[in-house]
Amino acid sequence: MSSKRTKTKTKKRPQRATSNVFAMFDQSQIQEFKEAFNMIDQNRDGFIDKEDLHDMLASLGKNPTDEYLDAMMNEAPGPINFTMFLTMFGEKLNGTDPEDVIRNAFACFDEEATGTIQEDYLRELLTTMGDRFTDEEVDELYREAPIDKKGNFNYIEFTRILKHGAKDKDD
């Protein structure tokens, strides 16, 4: 009789679970994702397609190749409606390290425990150690990074932004 039980258990679940995706985010995050989705869905048909991606990237001054757009579209298992968009972001965000792990990685180079690292020193570390960044990648990182007038990179705030998004200027 036990062999019948094991047969019924092994039948389920090759499917992607999207039903709980809305529970992963609070209302304000869902609203921000909805606004982003609507900006990308240029033709307003409720789905993001290759043309929508191209138009959105072009509006940002980028000129993406067909191969690049195809690679982006292939990350989705099917048509990208809002639920799929949210699911994909949830998977990406769940794939990042926990906040304390990221913060502690930066803290290793913060000998004074100030919560900041001198931006030139951090650039040197990022371009010469481990999985090396290019100067362009560091420039992109610094573009929206919390760096004060003295050139101190606030890694505590940066980690918060990385995991939770930037605060609005109005806040």
UniProtKB/Swiss-Prot annotation:
Post-translational modifications: Phosphorylation increases the actin-activated myosin ATPase activity and thereby regulates the contractile activity. It is required to generate the driving force in the migration of the cells but not necessary for localization of myosin-2 at the leading edge.
GO molecular function: calcium ion binding; myosin heavy chain binding
Pfam families the UniProt entry points to: EF-hand_11 (PF08976), EF-hand_7 (PF13499)
Keyword list, A-Z: Calcium, Metal-binding, Motor protein, Muscle protein, Myosin, Phosphoprotein, Repeat
SUPFAM superfamilies in UniProt: EF-hand (SSF47473)
Residues where Phosphothreonine is found: 18
Residue stretches making up the EF-hand domain: 28-63, 97-132, 133-168
Record has Zinc-finger as a keyword: no
GO biological process: platelet aggregation
GO cellular component entries: cytoplasm; cytosol; extracellular exosome; myosin II complex
More info: This chain binds calcium.
Assembly and interaction partners: Myosin is a hexamer of 2 heavy chains and 4 light chains.
Stated role: Myosin regulatory subunit that plays an important role in regulation of both smooth muscle and nonmuscle cell contractile activity via its phosphorylation. Implicated in cytokinesis, receptor capping, and cell locomotion.
Protein name in UniProt: Myosin regulatory light chain 12A
Native source organism of the sequence: Homo sapiens (Human)
The organism's taxonomic lineage, starting at the top: Eukaryota, Metazoa, Chordata, Craniata, Vertebrata
